[in-house]
Amino acid sequence: MNKKLEHRFVTELESNQNIVHKICSLYTNDRDSHNDLFQEITIQLWKAYPKFRGESKFSTWMYRVALNTAITLYRKSKRSIKTQDYDSVIFKIKSNEYDNTQEEQLKLMYKAVKQLGDIDKALIFLYLENKNYKEIAETLGITEVNTRVRMNRIKGKLKTILNP
């Protein structure tokens, strides 16, 4: 990867890393797992970046790669992240420590969301990020109608979980 492309990747990732941290919070239960998943998502983004065509916003593309990575790793019963000798640039990215205390109000919601299925988690996450149904559908690769139907079902499930 040339230096200009490398610099653009690092800049984009640093400015959008909170998206990755939020996804990590949805799919992990402890700080070490969170950091491991963050690193794996960063590696997958780095590997896929040369194929990014710019047909969508970087953040939309990043959501898709990050969610697919998180879901894939979440589904594996035994996580075995293979470490390879990647270009050192991906480890130069300054990762702000994610401060869970700033989101105390969302703890109950996250706990409820963690009880949902993989795709439903991704869908509600994008909804909570103020993405519209069209953007959610494009990111997850499902139809807009399916997105609306699933969202209504998810809202019902969350109401049941939060108000037993």
Identify the role of each PLM range.
Residues 80-109, 132-133:
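Internal acidic/polar
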Residues 36-43, 47, 56-68:
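Structural recognition of an alpha-helix C-terminal capping motif at a helix-to-coil junction
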